[in-house]
């Protein structure tokens, strides 16, 4: 696993596979020492997939202007089905495309977007929502609903939710407060 220590981030799925955010591969199988013996590619050809969330037999991933669900339907460990969940995200600020995908109560997935992206997000039902600059938002697993939940702070770099539902965010410019409690409909400076 030493080749993955400098990655943007790792996520672990329910089946204890570690998912690498940049290469979208997983470490398999685990040896007796608890370390993975080799990476296996689940999906490739993705454009800067900063947002990733393992879920059931696949994962949600941000790919260019879309959030897609890639899944393995035949059990071979590779994505063979692709479903567009949301589309229309801005791609002007590549270092903070939609990211920090986090499961939340009420069957939502929460995420953040960077400061200089401008887009009009389209749901699976065809509704469109203007989604500009730094924002936190949430969407349903099937893409049927999409809501903006806050504005700012400048470039959200971290999102964490406790088991009790308390949510914390961190920003690139912490303004003396490296971690902030997140409040829906909040307007954060920066």
Language-model segments: residues:
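Beta-propeller domains with acidic blade repeats across secreted/periplasmic ectodomains
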Residues: 1-190
